[in-house]
Amino acid sequence: MKLTLFILIVFVVLANVYAAGISERNIIGGRVIKLCGGGAQKCCDREPRCDPCRKCVQSFHSGVYMCSDKKSNCS
């Protein structure tokens, strides 16, 4: 039982490390989008920042922050 719990904890920690260190570009639904940081970081906290017309959004599935593929906020 303790071994199973230990393996589960290690798996969760490694999954979080992977999500935080995910590459800057990712393909979702066949579209290439630019990720912004990852983990708890928001787009404006660090490079790469979203272009001014694209909103920073959080992925529902992975929790990673990324630039929206839809243009909005344009003046």
Curated annotation (Swiss-Prot):
Propeptide: 20-31
Keyword Lipid biosynthesis appears in the UniProt entry: no
Tissue specificity statement from the Swiss-Prot or TrEMBL entry: Expressed by the venom gland.
Keyword Thylakoid: no
PTM (free text): Contains 4 disulfide bonds.
Compartments reported by the entry: Secreted
Keywords per UniProt: Disulfide bond, Secreted, Signal
Record GO cellular component, one term: extracellular region
Extent of the signal sequence: 1-19
Function: No toxicity is observed upon intracranial injection into mice and intrathorax injection into crickets.
Official protein name in the record: U14-hexatoxin-Mg1a
